[in-house]
Swiss-Prot record:
Protein name: Bifunctional purine biosynthesis protein PurH
NCBIfam families in alphabetical order: PRK00881.1, purH
The species this protein was found in: Bacillus mycoides (strain KBAB4)
Keyword Lyase: no
Classification via CDD domains: IMPCH
Length: 511
């Protein structure tokens, strides 16, 4: 008995050549709708699905392959005598190959003007049912859902007259990954449409972007996946113009740098090391902003990641060229800037849209045995909601530095303290187990630049000791959430040293 293949694809890439190869191997081809029309237009002889089912396609093609003659031919266990007897009795012929990819649901809902009705119409029913049936019975059926696998299947057919068991298993596994991802897209779309914030189950799907040389350390394997509908203002959707392949640590650091630089509307540059900012500067233009980011910590910036929210011009590129950097990220690079920076063959240059995330964005954190899901911390300073409990209010420059420090501190690992002076950070204290410890680190790093600076704390002061350390260093302004039972002690300490202090009412822990 001749082998049979059922071919019905929405992605027509390479399908004509593949079917030619099947026919050359003496395999009969059954097809449907637009696929059948395309194959016949290319002079290929195929059998219509209605000839197999004895039933016409109905309901605008919604029902065409959901038939016992199809699924019996797919699911029958060929070495089971009862199955074979039932096939013979009912006139069902086996189907040995299924070549199907699904309605373009992902592409449909990505359209800005898509309607709910359009989305629903592009939910495939018959396709997933067929490929799942074939994949379940992969001992006897080869199922192909990705044009990239056409050549492998044809090569094995030409060499062996059949597809190897190992390849069939790989193809079957790919099918179930494919349908799981497809169903995840549908469930997530419908869940979002219904406005459900915390459904009883969460199904996420990611698409492989690239294999990485290794993970955080050389002994760890790693892969980079991207979300199907992630914001284009993300590392996953950045375009690499130049340099070495991104590493695991590069991607993490670039993500951190992007998150910080998105906080600013004025020209800003952020330098990051190990996912913490080591220098942030703002200015009238991107050159001035970079100069301040560099001066913030000219030691730590070496080997760092730079993110800018304006085009990199030639003058800025020449300054960047002077030191060793891993990555420069910006919305764009002038041609002259590219010529300067591309002379460093390993320097990675990335372009990406700079657009702040919304509260609708979700942050996923893996823990042992589970997953934490929360909204991204996108809350900006609400100047109408702040209070100033001290006797003195901030000056105009103090306000600028307080706002800069507050934007940065929420991106620093807690306990976090950031000092800012003259439109740039001058000290960053990160990840200490007590707040005053982080303050001491930031003050030590700032040195003389701590004099007249503004201090931001990601959480309240449990004791007035941080205010006292700030006063000793000459810090003149503080911004913090407030809310401690000992707030009054910190306020009295600030007043005693003439420090102005702002309460925001908002905490920004980062773990």
């Amino acid at each position: 008995m001749k082998k049979r293949a059922l071919v019905s694809v929405s992605d027509k890439t390479g399908v004509v050549e593949f079917v030619k190869g099947l026919l050359e191997q003496g395999i009969e081809v059954i097809s449907t709708g637009g696929t059948k029309k395309l194959l016949e237009e290319n002079g290929l002889q195929v059998i219509g699905i209605s000839e197999v089912t004895g039933f016409p396609e109905i309901m605008d093609g919604r029902v065409k392959t959901l038939h016992p003659n199809i699924h019996g031919g797919l699911l029958a266990v060929r070495d089971n005598e009862m199955h074979v007897a039932q096939m013979n009795e009912l006139g069902i012929q086996p189907i040995d190959f299924v070549v199907v990819n699904l309605y373009p649901f992902k592409e449909t809902i990505a359209k800005p003007d898509v309607t709910f009705a359009d989305a629903i119409e592009n939910i495939d029913i018959g396709g997933p049912t067929m490929i799942r049936s074939a994949a379940k019975n992969h001992k006897f059926v080869s199922v192909i859902v990705d044009p990239v696998d056409y050549d492998v299947v044809l090569a094995e057919l030409k060499e062996n007259g059949e597809v190897t068991e190992e390849t069939k298993r790989k193809l079957a596994a790919k099918v179930f990954r494919h349908t799981a991802a497809y169903d995840a897209l549908i469930s997530n779309y419908l869940t979002k449409q219904m406005g459900e914030e915390s459904p009883e189950t969460v199904t996420v799907t990611f698409e492989k972007k690239q294999d990485l040389r290794y993970g955080e350390n050389p002994h760890q394997k790693a892969t980079f996946y991207k979300a199907p509908f992630a914001a284009t203002s993300s590392v996953a959707y950045a375009e690499q113009l130049h340099g070495k392949e991104l590493s695991y640590n590069n991607i993490n650091d670039a993500d951190a740098a992007l998150s910080i630089v998105k906080e600013f509307t004025e020209p800003a540059v952020v330098a990051v090391k190990h996912m913490n900012p080591c220098g942030v500067g703002v200015g009238a233009d991107i050159h001035e902003a970079y100069t301040r980011a560099y001066e913030a910590d000219p030691v730590s910036i070496f080997g760092g990641i730079i993110a800018a929210n304006r085009e990199i011009d030639k003058a800025t590129a020449e300054k960047l060229h002077e030191i060793f950097l891993e990555i420069v990220i910006a919305p764009s690079f002038s041609q002259e800037a590219l010529e300067v920076l591309q002379s460093k063959k390993n320097l990675r240059l990335l372009t990406v849209n700079i657009e702040k995330a919304t509260s609708a964005s979700k942050k996923l954190t893996s823990v042992q045995g589970g997953l934490l899901v929360q909204e991204e911390d996108t809350l900006s300073l609400d100047e109408d909601a702040i209070s100033i409990p001290t006797k003195r209010e901030p000056s105009e420059q103090e306000w600028k530095d307080l706002k800069l420090a507050w934007k940065v501190v929420k991106h620093v690992k807690s306990n976090a303290i950031v000092l800012a002076n003259d439109n740039m950070t001058v000290g960053v204290g990160a990840g200490q187990m007590n707040r005053v410890g982080s303050a001491k680190i930031a003050i030590t790093q700032a040195g003389e630049k701590a004099q007249g600076s503004a201090l931001a704390s990601d959480a309240f002061f449990p004791m007035p000791d941080t205010v006292e350390e700030a006063a000793k260093a000459g810090i003149t302004a503080i911004i913090q959430p407030g809310g401690s039972i000992r707030d009054e002690d910190s306020i009295k300490m600030a007043d005693a040293y003439g420090i102005t202090m702002v309460f925001t009412g908002v905490r920004h822990f980062k773990h």
